[in-house]
Swiss-Prot record:
Group of enzyme by EC: transferase
UniProt-annotated binding residues for isopentenyl diphosphate: 46, 49, 78, 97
One Pfam family named in its UniProt record: polyprenyl_synt
Similarity comment: Belongs to the FPP/GGPP synthase family.
GO BP term (any one): isoprenoid biosynthetic process
Cofactor: Mg(2+)
Cofactor, free-text remark: Binds 2 Mg(2+) ions per subunit.
Keywords, in A-Z order: Cytoplasm, Isoprene biosynthesis, Magnesium, Metal-binding, Transferase
Phylogenetic lineage: Bacteria, Pseudomonadati, Pseudomonadota, Gammaproteobacteria, Pasteurellales
Catalyzed reaction equations: isopentenyl diphosphate + (2E)-geranyl diphosphate = (2E,6E)-farnesyl diphosphate + diphosphate
Source organism superkingdom: Bacteria
Gene assigned in the entry: ispA
Protein's name according to its UniProt entry: Farnesyl diphosphate synthase
Organism: Haemophilus influenzae (strain ATCC 51907 / DSM 11121 / KW20 / Rd)
Binding site for Mg(2+) 2: 85, 91
UniProt: Mg(2+) 1 binding residues: 85, 91
């Protein structure tokens, strides 16, 4: 995992610099909006979604300069979603990545606007993507919009909110997280895929999608485990928040040991999909990172 950690750190450094550069020349007009956007987008984070964009795209021959734009766009969407998730009307969290959440650092109205603006910012960045065809550029916009909206992340959050204080089945829980967490991870792989010369290969797209579905669920299972076993200082947010909100989680439905086995099963499913892909791939190491991470 040492080699993978180095690659992840390189991605973090590259995407952070690129994201910072996207704000150059934008006037704040003394409003707090721009600072709130920067606060949410640039204040740390694992950058798993950008890593997936780069790893998939480079594996398939995409240019790194092209991938910068797709990676930045999906991270902007992710940052907006975290701002809104943390709001009092949603998950009501005060801590994110070891720092006060956006609505605590600024105020609730500014946080909402910062989330709105980051969503628009993501698509503005995508329209500037160089070295690809108009067809590919439109496909990037479509994939990110679908992954983030009513067929993906927003649907998952809505389902999650209405399931609070209710007993739900494992299949219902998986539906929530296939959308809330998994949809953007699938989008990340597809963005990298679309930026590559192989973007018309439907069989390859299918294997990548199934891999992403498995690691997307595994990511959430591990999140639920860390909400029980994690350390607040290490994971950068409050431990036990799911329990406080009476949310259905994998440990709640399967027990802690059952949840850990579920993560292992999903890891094996992800690896079996990668065996169908005839490329050397860093995304294999990502699957291991997801189920062993401590934050």
């Amino acid at each position: 995992m040492g080699h993978f950690s180095e690659e992840l750190q390189q991605v973090q450094t590259r995407i952070n610099r690129f994201l910072e550069a996207q704000f150059e020349g934008i006037e704040s007009h003394n409003a707090p909006l721009l600072e709130a956007m920067k606060y949410a987008l640039l204040l740390g984070g694992k950058r798993v979604r950008p890593f997936l964009v780069y790893a998939t795209g480079q594996m398939l021959g995409a240019e790194k300069q092209t991938l910068d734009y797709a990676a930045a766009a999906i991270e902007a969407i992710h940052a907006y979603s975290l701002i809104h998730d943390d709001l009092p009307a949603m998950d009501d969290d005060n801590l994110r990545r070891g720092h006060p959440t956006c609505h605590i650092q600024f105020d609730e109205a500014t946080a909402i606007l910062a989330g709105d603006a980051l969503q628009s910012f993501a698509f503005e960045i995508l329209t500037k993507t160089p070295n690809i065809s108009t067809e590919q550029k439109l496909a990037l916009i479509q994939i990110l919009a679908q992954g983030a909206g009513v067929q993906g992340m927003c649907l998952g959050q809505s389902l999650d909110l209405i399931s609070e204080h209710k007993q739900i089945s494992l299949s219902e829980l998986e539906l929530i997280h296939r959308n809330k967490t998994g949809a953007l991870l699938i989008a990340a792989l597809k963005l990298g895929f679309i930026c590559s010369p192989h973007f018309t290969d439907k069989r390859l797209e299918q294997s990548l999608t199934q891999y992403a579905e498995a690691i997307g669920l595994a990511f959430q299972v591990q999140d639920d485990i860390l909400d029980i076993e994690g350390d607040s200082a290490e994971i950068g947010k409050q431990v036990g928040a799911d329990l406080d909100l009476d949310k259905s989680t994998y440990p709640k439905l399967l027990g802690l040991s059952g949840a850990k086995q579920k993560a292992q099963d999903l890891y094996q499913s992800a690896l079996s999909e990668l065996e169908k892909i005839p490329f050397d791939t860093t995304v294999r190491a990502l699957a291991e990172f997801i189920i062993t991470r401590k934050s």
